[in-house]
Design a protein with these regions (language model features):
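C-terminal tail/sorting-segment detector
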Residues: 510-514, 528-530, 568-596
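Pro/Thr/Ser/Gly-rich low-complexity, intrinsically disordered linker/stalk tracts
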Residues: 383-436, 494-517
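Active-site-adjacent "subsite" loops/lids of carbohydrate-active enzymes
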Residues: 56-59, 63-88, 156-213
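Catalytic domains of carbohydrate-active enzymes, especially glycoside hydrolases
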Residues: 88-114, 214-216
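Beta-strand-rich modules
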Residues: 474-496, 573-575
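Aromatic-lined carbohydrate-recognition surfaces of secreted/lumenal glycan-active proteins
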Residues: 154-166, 220, 239-285, 331-340
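Short, surface-exposed loop/turn motifs with a glycine/proline- and acidic-biased composition
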Residues: 479, 555-579
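Substrate-binding cleft of secreted/luminal carbohydrate-active enzymes
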Residues: 292-293, 297-315, 332-402
Length: 596
């Protein structure tokens, strides 16, 4: 009853009245009829869809497909030059995802019995070099991990499990030769037999190889289920036992190596029939023997990314069901934005927007299928995502795996250097109890606010997330008004330390006494003078470049000085009293001013 009441409340807030009434009546439409559903209109939404602040912790993910180069790569690496072109394309993709504040990339790593890294178990996939079995001349997985981590993103190795490609393709042939009678043929394709114990053992080997060799943030299992056309000759419960055995073998293998690596999978989008909302025969638990909610309960999975490529009553009650059965773990609905392409479906962007709002309200986040349709800005989905993700976010911490807090950063220092504001600190690779942090990196989160001390629980103050290294440079235009800073450390489980704030004495020194770190407000025509100016016997104001050359002299016009003659750029402002003593008032950045 609780679930139904919550759903009806949300449905009434999201859908037009006629749609809500249809949901209440229990007359669910078929999937095919959804194309005729009227688009959701913003003015019809309740407060659940407005005044939402982007949360500090939220998974914002994308599936990045490599099979056939669908998302990447779009060219082959057959020489050092073409390999570099391929790498540059990935960097451009990641740059655009970073701008949209996406924090998790699920990269297809095992494609169809083939790999995008030099594996001792399976051959190269042909998506990189153009030739199955041939190296592109570099390790694509390692490159992607490095580039994601540079941008503060998590990289999860997406492993396609049961399907192994066309019967006569390289990956399938290799496995048929290696494991006689393990591969079953359905139509033109080969599949690993879920009921053969060798399947789970071998997939655990693959995931162990990836986990051991690479600094991945997660293993993401795809198609860990029975094929829909499989002739199931055992009971549904026995079928679930077989699939769960595979999941257990993989999970135990990964966690024995690196317990901070997130185990996840992408189950079918509806777990099972609900009391008032049927799945119409396509669900995880009954149809394909995928007990994904049980895997969360039993600790075999840290996260689920259910493929919820549906709308309206086919989406909302099932999203709530996933959230209610999350067992304190991470559940991230996969959104079918590929249907925004008229070649793929007849969706309107207003089918997706309320789904994003609802999953945010439920604390779930979202995952886009797939990258191409996001970055192609299909129906403006990328533009909306940029607005929706106003601030960076952190992936929720794995509190069920570790609660130890890293030690705070120390020696926080803020100063101007070569035209940039430099924020630096030092890390300690240990927890507060003195034990060593086992994860490969210590990450850092930088916060900034116009009030002191900085509230690190406020998502609006997070300016750099999951940062490697111990320094951040800000351009003058990024800190035009006075800012105060704080830094936290974070381990691979996502657990944050307490915040290290600027010392109060340093704040007073930098903002008031010495003054050079104070950012002065400039509207392009005038610089507003700080309060401290009232206490100075100022005769004239000097404007210098950051290199120390005086370029302008002015007198005040009340509480500001006119700087229209100055060229755009960064400058320091000084007051000079009648005795010739200079006082640093602060730094300002003049943008190009446009007359109305």
């Amino acid at each position: 009853m609780k679930k139904l009441s919550l759903f009806l409340l949300l449905l009434g807030a999201i859908l037009p009245n006629k749609q809500a009434a249809a949901g209440i009546s229990g007359q669910a439409a078929t999937l095919e009829s959804q194309a005729a559903t009227p688009a959701w209109q913003p003015e019809q939404a309740g407060s659940i869809l407005v005044s939402q602040q982007a949360p500090k912790h939220e998974v914002r993910a994308v599936w990045l497909t490599t099979i056939g180069g669908r998302d990447w790569p779009h060219s082959y690496a057959q020489s050092p030059i073409s390999a570099r072109k391929q790498q540059q394309e990935l960097c451009q993709i990641l740059d655009r995802l970073q701008q949209a504040k996406i924090n998790t990339v699920l990269l297809q790593t095992r494609v169809r019995g083939t790999m995008i890294y030099p594996s001792a178990l399976e051959p190269w996939d042909g998506c990189l070099s153009g030739f199955p079995g041939k190296s592109p001349g570099y390790d694509a997985l390692q490159f992607a991990i490095d580039e994601c981590h540079k941008r503060g993103m998590e990289l999860h190795a997406w492993v396609v499990t049961i399907p192994v490609g066309k019967w006569d393709a390289l990956g399938c042939r290799n496995l048929r030769r290696k494991f006689p009678k393990l591969i079953r043929k359905i139509g033109p394709d080969g599949y690993m037999n879920p009921e053969d114990s060798r399947t789970g053992n071998y997939l655990a080997q693959i995931c162990s190889e990836i986990t051991r060799r690479y600094d991945i943030d997660g293993i993401h299992l795809d198609y860990i289920r029975y094929p829909e056309n499989w002739n199931l000759k055992v009971s549904r419960q026995q079928g679930r036992n077989y699939i769960t055995s595979i999941a257990r073998k993989i999970s135990h293998a990964v966690k024995s190596l690196k317990p901070w690596v997130k185990m996840s999978c992408s189950p079918v989008g509806k777990y099972d029939d609900l009391t008032r909302y049927p799945s119409y025969g396509w669900n995880a638990n009954t149809k394909v023997c995928q007990d994904a909610q049980g895997w969360l309960r039993d600790g075999l999975m840290d996260a689920l990314f259910p493929m919820m490529y549906f709308r309206n009553e086919h989406f909302y009650p099932f999203a709530i069901d996933w959230q209610e059965q999350s067992h304190g773990r991470i559940v991230v609905p996969g959104l079918g934005i590929y249907f925004l392409d008229p070649k793929e479906g007849k969706w309107n962007i207003n089918d997706v927007i309320p789904e994003m709002h609802l999953t945010r309200n439920l604390g779930m986040g979202y995952c886009f299928f797939r990258n191409q349709f996001l970055l192609n800005n299909q129906q403006g989905i990328l533009d909306f995502t940029r607005r929706f993700n106003e601030y960076p976010s952190l992936v929720p911490p794995m509190t069920w795996a570790s609660t130890q807090k890293p030690k705070q950063p120390k020696a926080l220092d803020i100063k101007w250097r070569n035209g940039y504001m430099e924020i630096s600190w030092q890390n300690e690779a240990s927890y507060t109890d003195g034990t060593a942090i086992p994860t490969p990196h210590i990450y850092n989160n930088v916060y900034a606010s116009r009030t002191y001390p900085v509230d690190v629980n406020d998502a609006r103050n997070l300016i750099s997330a999951r940062r490697l290294g111990n320094m951040l440079l800000l351009k003058p235009e990024e800190c035009e008004k006075p800012l105060y800073f704080a830094v936290t450390s974070m381990d691979g489980y996502g657990t944050e330390s307490l915040a290290t704030q600027e010392k109060a004495a340093d704040v007073l020194l930098h903002r008031h006494a010495e003054g050079s770190a104070r950012m002065l407000y400039c509207d392009g025509k005038q610089v507003h003078l700080p309060e401290i100016t009232k206490n100075l016997d100022t005769r004239v104001f000097l404007v210098e470049t950051l290199q120390g050359s005086t370029v302008y002299r002015a007198t005040s016009e009340g509480n500001y000085i006119n700087i229209k003659p100055l060229s755009p750029g960064a400058y320091r402002l000084y007051s000079v009293n009648k005795r010739g003593i200079r006082h640093a008032l602060g730094t300002f950045y003049k943008k190009k001013f446009k007359e109305n």
